[in-house]
Amino acid sequence: MIDLYNYSNLEGLLDGLTDLNRIPKEYSAVLEPYFQNIARNAHLKSRALKICRSNFHKWNEEGAKTVNPEIIRRCLNLWYVLKGKEYKKLKDPPPADNIIKDEIDVSYVKNLNEVRLEFDEFGKLISNPLENLILEEVEVNDFIQE
C-alpha cells in the first residue's frame, strides 16, 4: 500500500502549494489531511509557515496583483491547521468560496442502519436515518456582516 503522507510527498506538496498549475484549485478542498500530516513534522511545519508568511506579506503589500486569492485561501487553511488559530494580520482577505454540493438522492439507499445505527431522543432505533434529510442552498453572504 502506498503511503500518501510520506515525507517526500508532503515536501512535494509544499513545493507546489503556491502553483495552481501543479495543484489546481479543484484540489484545494482535499488538502487538509496533507496539512495535518505536515503539522506532525517540525521541519515541514516550519517550511510551511515560512511559505504562508511570505504569501501573506505579498498579499498585504500588493494584494491580488501578485498572489492568487486561492493561494491565500490555501495558506489560511494551512496556517489554521498548523497553528490552531486564524491568521489575523491579513489585510482584506479574499472571500471564502461557497461550498456547493450537487443534488443528492438518498431515497434509493437501503439498509443504512447496517453501517451506522442511529437512535432518537427516546432511545428508539431510527429505521431510515436519512428519510427526513433536507438540504437547502444557502448563500453564506446573507449571514455575514461586513
Swiss-Prot record:
Keywords associated with the record: Nucleus
Compartment annotation: Nucleus, Nucleolus
Listed GO CC annotations: nucleolus
Chief location category: nucleus
A Pfam family per the record: Swm2
Keyword Nucleus: yes
This protein's record includes keyword Nucleus: yes
Protein family (similarity comment): Belongs to the SWM2 family.
Name under which the protein is recorded: Nucleolar protein SWM2
Species of the source: Saccharomyces cerevisiae (strain YJM789) (Baker's yeast)
UniProt gene name: SWM2
